[in-house]
């Protein structure tokens, strides 16, 4: 029973991974950053009561649900980029989409840290600028 369940999970996981073009460093980074962003958002609202997503700045289930829905749609857009790559015979649309979303998640994490009063190291600020420029240059190449 246990082996069958594990095998089923492996098959489903492998299928989903193949839909996204593989489980590479970019996709792993995006998923990790999405988790960090969601977690830091919970801390901002639950501990610091300083969220800009709710009227009183504290935890609200609807705001959390909206955040999870956004994360899900983000992954669907990555899936669309991957499938477009396959149809067009290219390999850069998915990467451009993932890099853009990594930059977006990084900005959100830094904003959440700022709402908690955490000082942001300049190297992180510079890395965000590099990610933004890379995403913009890939957008221009795709036009």
Positions of PLM-derived features:
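Alpha-helical transmembrane segments of multipass membrane proteins
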Residues: 11-16, 79, 83
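Helix-coil boundary and interhelical linker segments in multi-pass alpha-helical membrane proteins
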Residues: 16-27, 84-93
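Alpha-helical transmembrane segments of multi-pass membrane proteins
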Residues: 30-41, 74, 78-82, 100-108
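A cytosolic-side transmembrane-helix exit/cap motif
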Residues: 46-59, 112-122
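Juxtamembrane helix-capping/reentrant segments at transmembrane boundaries
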Residues: 51-74
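Hydrophobic alpha-helical transmembrane segments and immediately flanking/interface helices
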Residues: 87-115
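Canonical alpha-helical transmembrane segment with a positive-inside/aromatic-interface signature
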Residues: 106-139
